[in-house]
Amino acid sequence: MAGTLYIVATPIGNLEDITRRALRILAEVDLIAAEDTRHSKKLLHHFNIATPLISYYREKEQQRAEELIAKLHAGTNIALISDAGTPAISDPGAIVVNMARQASIPIVPVPGPSALTAAVSCAGLIPGEFLFVGFAPPKSTQRCTLLRSLRDLLYPLVFYEAPHRIERFLKDCLEILGDREILWARELSKKYEEITHATLGGLLASLNTEKLRGESVFIIYPPTVLP
């Protein structure tokens, strides 16, 4: 009988956000596949969980996914976790999930923290529709091509971005999309959490690149439609 693949959400900053169910699953499974075992060891140690860990990172995702599928076929129950938040959303995980689905291996989500839903919940989106893009391409040429393809959509656009690319990302957004409203959520659930509502131009003008830390979520509102 095949094992079960659990997709387990872990805190994005505040350890109090982990669910009791997540803790139970992490303690009960036979193996935990973690994006970075060094990072996850600290989390598991904090909660006195001694389940064995195996690394599952993007550079070796295909190879590791095949190994995990073999273990699942052999009856091993495995929990997949990322460094923070929900796995397989702009993090490694999609390959093993797809392989498990194609092999009819049970897949069980264990929902919890997510930077995406945390940011969207503070954006006041009515009726709640949005397009999640994830990380834009790191190179400006490719990023601008993507932004042009999204320019005419009447949906809020949700991006993740790394601190060292924020200024260039915002400049490209302003150039391609125009001076739209934007919500910037950074350090979510952490000590220095900050949620800023501004325009792209205003945010760029006030940006202090020396203080940028941690990954950010940006929600770019659709263009104002005049009657």
Protein language model features and the residues they cover:
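A contiguous loop/helix-start segment that scaffolds small-molecule binding in enzyme catalytic cores
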Residues: 2, 76, 155-227
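Alpha-helix capping/helix-boundary segments
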Residues: 38-40, 85-86, 115, 165, ...
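Conserved helicase motor
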Residues: 55-62, 136-140
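Class I SAM-dependent methyltransferase SAM-binding "motif I" and its flanking Rossmann-like core
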Residues: 95-153
